[in-house]
Amino acid sequence: MHTLNSEKETKNFAKLFAQNLKPNDIVLLNGDLGAGKTFFCREIIKHFCGKNTNIISPTFNLLQIYKTPNFNIYHYDMYRIKSPEEIYELGFEEALNGNLILIEWSEIIKHLLTPPLIEVNLKILDNNKRLCSIKKENFLFDFL
């Protein structure tokens, strides 16, 4: 578990985390509304696509795809999904072929996913302070 005391610390932590990701990784991001899931994803995407990449939250259209030189990043937001099967209408099977997948609000579809999965859990401690834990295959994942 890591205590992130500011937005800057969260940004740096997400950048370090991104350095450990590769194609075929599936990252599940969980936390209450406003915990920083999209913020965390934004830093991961910038790591691979460049800091000037225009990153749009997938909250309303459920999916944003970003291209890197070697793979795509599929950024899903499941907050408004009513049925787990809806993920297949969003190109999920295609996403599984050598791409990096980021899924916010993943609880509704987690049972459909095949391990290994990387789970990022963010908890609000106060205004800009967060508690972050990362698990991979039921083990705490510490890359620092």
UniProtKB/Swiss-Prot annotation:
GO cellular component terms listed in the entry, alphabetical order: cytoplasm
Cystine residue pairs: none
Descriptive protein name: tRNA threonylcarbamoyladenosine biosynthesis protein TsaE
Key word Membrane present: no
Keyword DNA-binding: no
InterPro entries: P-loop_NTPase (IPR027417), T6A_TsaE (IPR003442)
Role according to the record: Required for the formation of a threonylcarbamoyl group on adenosine at position 37 (t(6)A37) in tRNAs that read codons beginning with adenine. Is involved in the transfer of the threonylcarbamoyl moiety of threonylcarbamoyl-AMP (TC-AMP) to the N6 group of A37, together with TsaD and TsaB. TsaE seems to play an indirect role in the t(6)A biosynthesis pathway, possibly in regulating the core enzymatic function of TsaD.
GO process annotations (BP): tRNA threonylcarbamoyladenosine modification
Alphabetical keyword list: ATP-binding, Cytoplasm, Magnesium, Metal-binding, Nucleotide-binding, tRNA processing
Cell location: Cytoplasm
Binding site for Mg(2+): 38, 104
Protein residues bound to ATP: 7, 34-39
Entry's family note: Belongs to the TsaE family.
Gene Ontology terms for molecular function: ATP binding; metal ion binding
Chief subcellular location: cytoplasm
Pfam short name (any one): TsaE
